[in-house]
């Protein structure tokens, strides 16, 4: 807080006719430290970011593929909750536990719906619950559960034309691929190569409870990231309307 009633205890406080006082705040925060959208230029390999732009365009801020265009347009579409934790009969998925696009299809079938082209996929693992229970120990041997890379999975996302992948984990995928040992390969394959927007660290618990109760796992999904100039990401507060 930068202004409150105590600000008027000195002679340097603002003075308005009529005696108006007020409170004011400012925020100093990491743009990707909470529920957030990644910019398409957030991650790259081989010296090229999304759409073939040179990685040097990221120096000092993203001249290309920043989060601002996502903020300007917003995201609106049919959202689909895929409750992988509940589907597997678990309170939360285990550290390093993986699943594939075929598992997503099986989860959708068990929930009584299909995954259609252009759906916004929202995957619940409930793994962040471990952070609240374990504190700093959460990061020991850190490896989140999540989707794992395969050519077939990437082709499935391409064929379905999925525009947005949303999860309750920090990285939207298993942290280290168990086969190749590569870190975050789907950030490269889905975001960098296919242009799929990533939304991470979402609190899906109330939504999951609602969907389990009424068996309605599809809904209107709306999100409007901040239009931060040249930024690598933005905080966001997604809204679901059922």
Cite the ranges covered by each PLM segment.
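Active-/binding-site microenvironments in catalytic and ligand-binding cores
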Residues: 1-242
């Amino acid at each position: 807080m930068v202004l409150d009633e105590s600000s008027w205890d000195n002679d340097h406080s603002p003075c308005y006719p009529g005696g108006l006082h007020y409170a004011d705040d400012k925020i100093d925060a990491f743009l990707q430290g909470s529920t957030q959208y990644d910019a398409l230029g957030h991650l790259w390999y081989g010296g090229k970011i999304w759409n073939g732009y040179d990685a040097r365009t990221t120096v000092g801020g993203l001249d290309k593929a920043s989060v601002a265009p996502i903020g300007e347009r917003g995201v609106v579409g049919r959202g689909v909750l895929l409750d992988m934790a509940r589907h597997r009969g678990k309170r939360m998925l285990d550290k390093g536990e993986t699943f594939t696009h075929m598992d997503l299809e099986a989860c959708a079938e068990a929930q009584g719906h299909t995954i259609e082209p252009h759906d916004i996929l929202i995957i619940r693992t409930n793994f962040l619950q471990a952070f609240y229970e374990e504190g700093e120990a959460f990061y020991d041997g850190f490896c989140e559960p999540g989707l794992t890379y395969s050519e077939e999975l990437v082709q499935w996302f391409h064929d379905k034309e999925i525009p947005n992948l949303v999860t309750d984990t920090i990285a939207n995928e298993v942290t280290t691929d168990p086969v190749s040992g590569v870190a975050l390969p789907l950030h490269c394959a889905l975001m960098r190569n296919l242009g799929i927007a990533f939304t991470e660290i979402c609190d899906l618990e109330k939504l999951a409870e609602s969907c389990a109760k009424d068996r309605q796992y599809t809904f209107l999904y709306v999100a409007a990231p901040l239009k931060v100039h040249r930024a690598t990401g933005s905080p966001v507060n997604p809204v679901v309307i059922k």
